[in-house]
């Protein structure tokens, strides 16, 4: 059975909806007067970059201000103390022949490699620790010498001039390093082998032939 809607009910529903709509659209205050919208002012916040009067000092910068050199100048690398230390290393003493430089580097490596092999080798708790450690250090010297020779063959061609720069970073002329040639690198590799084996023999002689009292067995 269909139900008919009375006119009174429709008027009540329409008046209720209109009153709700008016309440949502125009809210009223406590005094039943409609609230007025207070005009607001839009504030804009602007940030401006101000250039400093003096340029900031960069701690790390390219050497001589040239980024194409491919090296950076830092407070450590540009320190006179660090420069003095590096210039006194055997590999950077260009006034010394490559053969003597290789002997000096090899002596240091051979002498100091014996101790770790003796104390940390597989035969460290046996009576053969000294001999086994010395032979292992000598074997490592041979391997390093072969690697140095392979690097020289792959990097330098026989008869070509030195690949080292003939100018310093400040533009001063200098004699090219003879180590950066095929002949110079061959002498350095031979000197490293001779010095390394000599260092191993000298360390074994001091530890087990002279039996120095300060050596802790």
Curated annotation (Swiss-Prot):
Entry's Pfam families?
A: PsaL
Q: Name one GO cellular component term.
A: photosystem I reaction center
In the UniProt record, does the keyword Membrane occur? Answer: yes
Q: How does it sit in the membrane?
A: Multi-pass membrane protein
Localization annotation: Plastid, Chloroplast thylakoid membrane
**Database matches in InterPro entries:** PSI_PsaL (IPR003757), PSI_PsaL_sf (IPR036592), PSI_suXI (IPR022980)
- Residue numbers on the Stromal membrane side: 49-135, 211-217
Record-annotated membrane-spanning stretches: 136-156, 190-210
State the superkingdom: Eukaryota
For the keyword Secreted, the answer is no
Transit peptide (residue range): 1-48
**Lumenal face: residue ranges?**
157-189
Primary location? plastid
One BP term from GO:
photosynthesis
Protein family: Belongs to the PsaL family.
Identify this protein by name. Answer: Photosystem I reaction center subunit XI, chloroplastic
Q: Which organism is it from?
A: Cucumis sativus (Cucumber)
What gene, per UniProt, encodes this protein?
PSAL
């Amino acid at each position: 059975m269909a139900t008919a809607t009375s006119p009174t009910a429709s008027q009540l529903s329409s008046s209720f909806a209109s009153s709700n709509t008016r309440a949502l659209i125009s809210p009223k205050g406590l005094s039943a007067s409609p609230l007025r919208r207070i005009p607001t002012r839009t504030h804009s916040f602007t940030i401006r970059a101000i250039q400093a009067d003096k340029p900031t000092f960069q701690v790390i910068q390219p050497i001589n201000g040239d980024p194409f050199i491919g090296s950076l100048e830092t407070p450590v690398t540009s320190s006179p103390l660090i420069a003095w230390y590096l210039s006194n290393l055997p590999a950077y003493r260009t006034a010394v022949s490559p053969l003597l430089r290789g002997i000096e580097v090899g002596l240091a490596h051979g002498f100091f490699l014996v101790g770790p092999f003796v104390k940390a080798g597989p035969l460290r708790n046996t009576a053969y620790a000294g001999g086994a450690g010395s032979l292992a250090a000598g074997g490592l010297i041979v391997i390093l010498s072969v690697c140095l020779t392979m690097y020289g063959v792959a990097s330098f061609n026989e008869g070509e001039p030195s690949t080292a720069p003939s100018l310093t970073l400040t533009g001063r002329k200098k004699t090219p390093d003879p180590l950066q040639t095929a002949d110079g690198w061959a002498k350095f590799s031979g000197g490293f082998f001779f010095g390394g084996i000599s260092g191993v023999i000298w360390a074994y002689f001091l530890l087990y032939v002279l039996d120095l009292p300060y050596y802790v067995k």
